[in-house]
Every structure is written in structure tokens, then in C-alpha cells.
Amino acid sequence: MSGNKVEVDKRRTFAIISHPDAGKTTITEKVLLFGNALQKAGTVKGKKSGQHAKSDWMEMEKDRGISITTSVMQFPYGGALVNLLDTPGHEDFSEDTYRTLTAVDSCLMVIDSAKGVEDRTIKLMEVTRLRDTPIVTFMNKLDRDIRDPIDLMDEVENVLNIACAPITWPIGSGKEFKGVYHILRDEVVLYQSGMGHTIQERRVIEGINNPDLDKAIGSYAADLRDEMELVRGASNEFDHAAFLKGELTPVFFGTALGNFGVDHILDGIVEWAPKPLPRESDTRVIMPDEEKFTGFVFKIQANMDPKHRDRVAFMRVCSGRYEQGMKMHHVRIGKDVNVSDALTFMAGDRERAEEAYPGDIIGLHNHGTIRIGDTFTQGEKFRFTGVPNFAPEMFRRIRLRDPLKQKQLLKGLVQLSEEGAVQVFRPLDTNDLIVGAVGVLQFEVVVGRLKSEYNVEAIYEGISVSTARWVYCKDERKLEEFRRKCSQNLALDGGDNLTYIAPTMVNLNLSMERYPDIEFAKTREH
């Protein structure tokens, strides 16, 4: 038991959230560099400047499917063992991105300091709110001209509704960027750009009133002292309890491209971020230091190579210890399975897992029996909660080139929806099939997989659907009346749950006003 507790206490499991182009890929790489997880030789190719260097296993090669190793990286740092879960950006954005956030204990939010809070960040923060996930903030790109730091923090507070506590404070920006003042340590760290894989030795001046500071940065020292008077008066002090409740975020400034400030973030995560947390189930709360193994599946990644129908189910370990060859109980189907070939992810290598502890992520080979949200135990029958389906944001009607294959199409879509690749809706009043997704890439993936795995050729057509909501009502009679009057807007999803398909947001809002007893839900438990 005590061995387990030691391992649990070491773990920190977090994800990085940001708007595309805020620097997430760079920061992921630099976090691995500071964690010594990025091997210096053989893994980096890029222009001589190193600016475009990208480790091979982070290149998302769509033509052969996204390499599984992009998803989980584990490395030691400061006496802890850090699990970093990547959330795909850009067009790879999908429901997976949202669901990954249900498997972590904290998040690092990266903001482009020239732009401030952007819409993708707002959406991702809404998801972290479902579980009050603690958030660490990094204001990136200080080597460029940025917006006023106090304005940036005000925007985070107002738009994202979370208090900000600055931990480091920038001295200048762009060409005049001199470094940061670490408020809690009362020290100035001078900026020296370390590009690519060079981590410069820290130049630190102890104390804001140290005369050496004036020698090093001239008039910027006096400006910093004045500014700190203002900042101390106007901003929040760091409060660990408020951070753990998701009410306050510690804010760091730096430049990931210049390898500066990343170590401050990692120090903060190791010192303050929660170790693996207890998890709710439908019967009780599962504590991480329990002896028996438990875990849940939050993501299924299909290998898009048709020769290998290898799908990997990503499982977050919640309690106990995974050992190679152990027997697990797959609760939903009521079967025991022997797991001898689970994968672990150490610095981008796909290795067979010898063991794994709470907070770790392991990959199970899945031949179609595992679904998102599935719980695995050592025999106990319960289901972990908190792995939701999210209302899609994009919709297409899907149509067959060969109308005789309707049955295969429906079967394929239902199976893909169980896996979480896409959501499917069957309107009550028509024979249409509507596919819903969070990101464009999901549509492409589905057509490709229908063809390779189900031998079905399908095409998409536009459809005037703006959003979807799952519909619930405690009063069976009122639900039946609603179903009768609004049938032209109702559909069943892949799991036969009643769903309201709204052509416009105005239509949805009117229906919500007209039927106050009906709940229109944005998320649904798996």
C-alpha cells in the first residue's frame, strides 16, 4: 500500500489548452526539453535556426493517421513524474480534445500575449469548469511586442471568470524584453534567448532592490519597482486553496520559443498542481490510494492504416496498480480480460507497460469491444462518471452512393459514434442520417473509415442545423406532448437518446422558453 502511495504522490497529470498559434506545440516541446525527455540526437529535424524544429513523433501525418505517441508523454521533473496529455489543435480539434480534459488533474493555459484570450481557449475553459480543474496560466511570446500585462490579466479575469495571481512579472517586451521578476522568490531572472535545444544558464539577481539590478538593466529597474507597487495593490496574491478549487490561476510570463520561463511553469506544476485526485462513480468515490486497480477510457484512437484495424483505447488509471498480464473486469460487458500488452508512453516511445499507477495513462488494444467511458476494475461493479458527450457544433447530412447499403451505413455510424469518432442523429420524421462533430477533421475521418472498414461509400451534403441538445423531462406526459408537437426537430442519437436538432439558436431559445419543464442539455454522460 505504502509503495502505491509513494508513486501516487509523485504523479502530476496535466493537459495544455490554448487557441491555435498561441504556441502550444512549441511549449509542449520545450516542456519535454526541460524535462530532459526530448533526446538531443536523432529526433529533431528542422531549419538551422531550430525555430521550426519539431520532434518526429509530434508531426501529425494525417495520411497515415495521427501517431499515437503524440497523445501522452511522461517524463521526470523536480522529483515528480509528469504526465502531459496533448490536446490536438487546429483542424485536428475534436471531441477528443474536450474529453482529454476529463482525464487530467490540472491544465496549463497558454495565451498569446499579443492577442489575449481567444475563442478556442474560452471553449476549452468551459470544459474545465465541469470539474473545476485547477488552471496554471502562461503568457507566451514575450519576445514580441505584447499587450499591457495588467490588461491581459483583466481580460482573463473578466472573460474566463477566474482570478489571476501573477507569480512572475515581465520586464519589457519585444526587442526590449529584459527578463522576469519572480514575485514569490523576490528575484529577477534575466532573459537570454536559448533557441532550439539550448537551455541557457539562468542569470539571477537576488532582490528587487539589489543595486546589481540597476547595473544589469539600467532604468528598467526603477520602472520595475514602480510597477510592482501598482501590481501588488491591484492583483490577487496566490492562494493555493483557491487554485485547487479552480477559482484562481497563477500567471507566469515568458517565451517558449526562447526557452525562457518554461522552468518556472514546471516548478509551479510540481509544487502546486494536485496529485491524482479521487474520482466519482455511480456508486461511490474511488480514492487513488486504494489497493484494487480501477480505470476509465476517455479516448479511442483509430489507426487509419486500413491494413491494421488496431484501435487503441486510452485509459486513465484511477486507483491501484496495473501490472503486465493482470486480469481486469470490463464492467459494461461484464467480462474479465487478461491484459498483457498495454502500452505506456515514455517520452514519445510506444512501449509495453510493465506497470502503471494512478494518474498514468495506458493504451489498451481494442478490437471494437471498448467504448469511450468504459470502466475497468478488478471485479467491483460500478461506472466512473464525468466522461461526457458534447453537443456537436458542425452538422452534415450523410448520403450513400449505393442506396442498397443503408444497413451497413447505419451499423458503421452507430459503431463509430460508440467509439466517439462522431455523433449520429436519426430524425424522427425523415429517413435522413445527420452526422455531428466538433471539428472538421472528424467528418473526413468518418468517410475514410466507412469506406475502409465497412465498405460503404458515403458523401456529405449541407444541412441547416445550428446546434443540438439532449432532451430530458421528469414528467413522462409532458415529454410525450413535447415529442408530438416538436417531432420535426427531434432525432435519436447513436444510443437512442432523444435529441433536439435546432436549425438556429433563435429557434432553440424559443423552444426553451415555450417548454420550461424540458431540460435541453449541452452534454450527456457516456
Swiss-Prot record:
Main location: cytoplasm
Gene Ontology cellular component list: cytosol
Subcellular location: Cytoplasm
PROSITE patterns: G_TR_1, G_TR_2
Matches recorded under Pfam families: EF-G_D2 (PF22042), GTP_EFTU (PF00009), RF3_C (PF16658)
A single MF term (Gene Ontology): translation release factor activity, codon specific
Record-level GO BP terms: regulation of translational termination
SUPFAM superfamilies documented for this protein: EF-G C-terminal domain-like, P-loop containing nucleoside triphosphate hydrolases, Translation proteins
Binding positions (GTP): 18-25, 86-90, 140-143
Keywords from the named record: Cytoplasm, GTP-binding, Nucleotide-binding, Protein biosynthesis
Keyword Metal-binding: no
Superkingdom of origin organism: Bacteria
Residue ranges occupied by any tr-type G domain in the UniProt entry: 9-277
Keyword Protein biosynthesis belongs to the record: yes
CDD domains xref list: RF3, RF3_II, RF3_III
Homology family: Belongs to the TRAFAC class translation factor GTPase superfamily. Classic translation factor GTPase family. PrfC subfamily.
Physiological role: Increases the formation of ribosomal termination complexes and stimulates activities of RF-1 and RF-2. It binds guanine nucleotides and has strong preference for UGA stop codons. It may interact directly with the ribosome. The stimulation of RF-1 and RF-2 is significantly reduced by GTP and GDP, but not by GMP.
PANTHER family (alphabetical): PEPTIDE CHAIN RELEASE FACTOR RF3
Protein name: Peptide chain release factor 3
Organism of derivation: Shewanella putrefaciens (strain CN-32 / ATCC BAA-453)
